[in-house]
Structure formats: structure tokens, C-alpha cells
Amino acid sequence: MLITTLLTLAFGQDTLPVYSGRGNQLSVAIPRLEAQAAVDGRLDESAWSRAARLTDFSQFQPVDGRAAEEATEVLVWYAPDAIWFGIRARENHGNVVRATRANRDNIASEDHVQILLDTNNDRRLAFLFGVNALGVQQDGTRSDQFGGGAGGQSATGGGTGNINPLDGTVDLNPDYVFESRGRLVDGGYEVEIRIPFKSLRYQEAEVQNWGIHVLRRVQHSGYQDTWAPAVRANASFLGQSGTLTGLRELRRGLVLELTPTAVARLDGSPETPEGWDYASDGELSGDVRWGIRQNLTLNGTVNPDFSQVEADVGQVLLNERFSLFYPEKRPFFLDGLELFDTPNQLIYTRRIVAPEGGVKLAGKVASTNIATLLAFDGKDQSWTGDHHPFFGVMRLRRDLGQNSTLGGVLTTREDGGDYSRLAGADLRLYHSRLYYVELQAVQSWTDSAGVSRSNPYLSATWDRTGRQWGFNYGVRAVEDGFNDAAGFVNRTGVIDAHIFN
């Protein structure tokens, strides 16, 4: 009986689906289980014994292509309403794992793992879910496309948890709902993650394939490892992802969030010797978020209250020629913000200072990203003091081939009888994994105090990302008078070029 049991256990362990990254087994048939597990950092429930196992990581930095020094194993399965990940990260150098109860997103200087889910399987944009050894969360998006976000994200991802600042844009401003818990164990750490499907936008196909990249940061050595072997001699990091195959019968449920807010204030002052004089004031506001479909989300807001939003980090203005640049942190604007991204930051939502009301639709239909935003700004910036500007923004981007895109953008800011309008197109073409070319042509039309003008903005970039050598050549021409009132173009009347080798 004992021998039979041992043989059964050994046979069961051997037949677990194992996918070796270094063995190029990058197509993962993810198991669908009618099960749940407690998110406690302990991978001891029966569901984990039936999960797919991602093993044999490769080093990405400092030397890509080598076998990872520290072993990492990622378990993955999904239930009807969520996808689950279990992480076993081994450490062979003793008690050197760095893990603290850091603030959300601030785990870049600690041992951590990032899971990138490309739910549209287009190798262009992925949801980012990161955790340190204690389960402290990091989340956002990662894109190979552009170097600047609509909410003020820089090409290096703002320096908060960016795995490699040379590979696309990491935006950690969005926050998603997911569960995680981790713990230190002998020889490393373990983390358990549950991501509900209602936190994601994904395709409408009955059977789906999702792109997946898993990255591990080993803090004491500075090494960065990936499950799918990734080389830096490639113009697309997400293009080197693996694939989760066969996801079906996903239950997202009703995605409807209502956030009513009431704010009251009572002021008192000793106006007379007999007593105080009191005055009161109050405001009502509300937000709604509706997941119309798996791939489309509608947001609305009326008189939004941003008093609980994290304050901006102070900046010192030394050169008055350029405006200060702040990231977007307001919840209404953050949801789906990555779909508004353009080259050269033609959309910058911080231009809408104090919205009185707004509506936004964002998502992906077939091979086209769609993002629209309409809002009234309560912050009057006119000379007369009686105008509330209206903002309208539309961004479309169509997938071409494996990684290339063709996009268009329309923006307008209407302020009384004045206006600032813009239309543009951009093209990004990849070739032979090493090269990409990015072209953009934009025209602005402005009418202010009865004076009309029309001015162009043109830019071009040619890039090669290679192991031995690479380059990035670019030129930009912005005519004097070009005006993008809904974007962040901090200097006009210039022609400049850059050469990096």
C-alpha cells in the first residue's frame, strides 16, 4: 500500500504541466479549475497541485540569454471569475531577500516579481501586476509604443518600479483591484496572487489567448530574470512574451461602480462681542464606472471630489520657458489612460484642472483602440472670468501586423468664442525585430480674440536596438504659433534633432 501511494504521488508530480522558459515551451495550456483558494501566501491548497508550472528563467540583465542564478517557479490556473498566480522564488545566498511593508508601487528597490498580462494578445500593451516578498502590491501598465503618457508619465516610467527604463513605457499611476499575500521562507519567498477578471479588459472571443511575461528582480545582485527568454537586441520587449492558451467561459460579472460623495463645511468667526457668526457650505458629487463589455468601459463624473487624491510632489521652477510637468493621479482620468497615449504627448489630462463634469469611453474593439473624453472645466482661465472651457479628445490606434500601429488624434478646447483644435496622425513600423520607424504629422488651428492661425508639428524617429550596437535618430519641427491646449508641448518655434549611438 505504501509503495503504491508513493508511486501514485510520484506519477502525479511528474505529469503536472511544466513549461520551461529556456526550453522555449512558451505556449501554456492554463488549467481551468472550479476551485478557490485562500490568499494567504501558502501554496498548499489542492488547486496549486494542478496548476501549470512556469520554470527555467533566463537572465535579462546584466547579460541576457544566460540561465538565471536563482530558481523561480510560477504556478498559474484560473477559475471562472479570476486568474491565480503562485510564486516560489528561491535564494541561494542566505538571508538576503529585501522586503518591507512599503507603500503601494514603491517596491523597485526590493526583491519583487512582475506579471505582465497582455489580455488582447497584441504584444503592444500589458497590465502590470507586481508584488514584493511580503505581497506589497505594484500595478499599472507597460507599453512598447510611446515615450510619454496622457497623464504625465515619462519614458522611464517615472522611476517607480521600472524593470528596464530602455524598454518602452511603464506607468504605475493606475490602480487595479487584486489580492496578494507573501511570506519569507527558508531559501527564498512565496507569494500568492488573485486577479479578478472584472479588473481587466479583454477580448470577447469564446476561447482566448493572452500574452504573459514574468520578470523577477533579485535585489542583492541587481540581476533581472524573465521566464520567456528576452534579449535586449529586440525593438519590442512585449513581442518576446509567452502565451496563456485556451481561456474560456470567463465570468466578469456586472462591472458597475457608483461613488457618491458629500462634502460639508462649517466656518465660524467671532464677528461680535456677543458671539460667533457661522456660515455653512456643502457639495454633492459622484462618479460612475460601467463595464459595458469585456473590452469597453464607460466612466462619468459630476463635480468630482479629489480631496483624497495623493498630493503632487513639489517641484522647483528654475527655467520659466518650460511648464512644470505633473503625473495624473485623479481616479476618473486614470482608468484607461494608457489608451490616450500619443507620441509627443498631444493629450495631457492635467490640462483639465477642475472638471465640473465629464464622460469617457475607452477600450479595444477588434484591432482598434478607442479612447474618447468630453469634459467641462470649472477652472476659468479667461480674462473676463465668465467662461468654463470645454475639452474634447479622441484617440484611435489600429494594429498593423505583429507590432506596428497606425493612429489618429483629435482634440479641441472651446473657451467662449475662442478655440484651440488639433488633428494628427502617427505611424510606428517595426522591421526584423531590431528596427522601428515612428512618424507623426499634426496640425493645430487656433482662434483667439479674433486672430486665427494654423501651424504644423512634424516629427520622425528611426531606432535600432541591437546587442552590439544600436542607434536612435530623431528630428522634430514645431512651427511658432503651434498650440495644443489639450496636450503638453512645452516649446514651439523650434527645429531640433538628436543622435544617439
Which positions does each model-derived feature cover?
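Bacterial N-terminal signal peptides
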Residues: 1-8
